[in-house]
Amino acid sequence: MSKTLNILELTSACIKLAQESGDIIRDVFKSGSLGIEMKSVDDPMTKADLLSQQHIIGSLRTIWSDIKIVGEEQCEIPTIDKKPPIDLLANDKDCIEKCPEEFKQLPIDDLIIFIDPLDATREFTLGRVGCVMTLIGISFKGKPIAGIIYQPFVDCNGDGTTDQSKWVGRTIWAIVGGGIPVKGIKDRRAPEDVGKVILTTTASHFNDKVQQAVDAIKPDKLLRAGGAGYKSLLVIENQADVYVFPTVGSKLWDICGPHAILLAVGGKLTDPQGNDIIYSTDPEKIENKNGIIITISNHQKYIDLLKNFKN
């Protein structure tokens, strides 16, 4: 019989580890010694990426040694003695009242944790830290069930800043199912943007396919930004209506955490043809080869616009 775990306990541990990851990232940034290495063209890795991932995975292994974990970076995982807390949500009224009972005994074999220890690494190396975040997603039988986003470089209003004296960090998390409210988000739509169609897409990997998608949707406003997690959050918090990246580049660790949060607020994420993303440890399926489209509403409308434009 498969071992089981309580999703509230696993989410508790991941929340705390994402926050501690933020401490690591801030410390590396403040040191000025980022230890930048290039994994490939325009794909940097820093000391903060490695230390963050080692801390998260090493800590999770102290409790759940058998759970499948997929992290962005290829690195050795050290032995860690300190166990992360699993009781952060034990007194959360929403969790107590609304978490489905079956979520408290999920078979470990059906779970995968996806970790992007430092999303928007390129922006991090350039000092544009407002879009930097740690992403942790948990999938169950191929579908997102919980997600955590931690933003290290934001102020008390949740706005990115380079002013170190204002860094307080922000945690956003959700468990999909049962109606547990998403924690840490707010509607950030500017009054002047009400009624507009706002599209967000890549800043650093803009190409002909991306331009074609923009032309197909014809947004009133275009937001080009770094970090898949950051752009997903723009949609989750209603700053953008749709995030389109219709080409290779994003990976499952970029989207699993945001995908869970998106589902919990009623949004949707698929590939640009409308096909569901299946979360797997298969190396051939880690990359979203057809790209992604993320919406808070009217998902099929945007799928149709892309299809009609292509045809």
Curated annotation (Swiss-Prot):
Pfam families: Inositol_P. It catalyses: adenosine 3',5'-bisphosphate + H2O = AMP + phosphate; adenosine 2',5'-bisphosphate + H2O = AMP + phosphate; 3'-phosphoadenylyl sulfate + H2O = adenosine 5'-phosphosulfate + phosphate; 1D-myo-inositol 1,4-bisphosphate + H2O = 1D-myo-inositol 4-phosphate + phosphate. GO terms for biological process: phosphatidylinositol phosphate biosynthetic process. Its cofactor is Mg(2+). Mg(2+) 1 binds at E72, D116, L118. Its EC number is 3.1.3.7, 3.1.3.57. The active site is at D49 (proton acceptor), T121 (proton acceptor). AMP binds at T202, H205, G227, K231. InterPro entries: CysQ/Inositol_MonoPase, Inositol_monophosphatase-like, Inositol_monophosphatase_CS. This is 3'(2'),5'-bisphosphate nucleotidase 1.
